[in-house]
Amino acid sequence: MKQYKIVVICMCILLLLAGGVYAQQKTVRILAIGNSFSQDAVEQYLHELAEAEGISTIIGNMFIGGCSLERHVKNARDNAPAYAYRKIGTDGKKREKGKMSLEAVLADEDWDYVSLQQASTFSGMYETYEASLPELIEYVKVRLPKKTKLMLHQTWAYASTSRHSGFKNYNCNQLTMYQAIADAVKKAAKANKIKIVIPSGT
């Protein structure tokens, strides 16, 4: 089931790329600022699917397991070298650098797309987006070209049998969690004028 979700995520991203002018003009550079859910989204299959469609990509993932928007903001304020920076080049090979900061990675490429996401535990709690997302967006925007498009990654709900401690936030109910995530992401995207949502949780 998880593998199916990963493929769906990649296809959603791929459709966005294929519909843009970049698809035939240049290498598309995509950066995810996230956690293990962004690892699933961009480190598996996306390069291969894009390559099959004739789309050249450079894919970056700033990884900290379970990282929340609040923690990303703290890392930004402190310019903390807290991330594992995983980068898949046009050759499809993945390389990793440890102890990287947001500022350093944002400057590493001329990014076309940057995705942001909340940690799964808080992904259906709008107040957590409201508290941290605007500051993170402001930090990112001033360090990116004007052409860069921001995306919000809508993650999926836990399995109905999950024992994750964060599941209690949703009464341990998968449908409740899904609806909360969909509502929170929609509201956060509108409030922060993010036009692209990757609906991997649907």
List the predicted regions and their residue ranges.
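Conserved SGNH/GDSL esterase-like catalytic core that processes O-acyl groups on lipids
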Residues: 28, 40-129
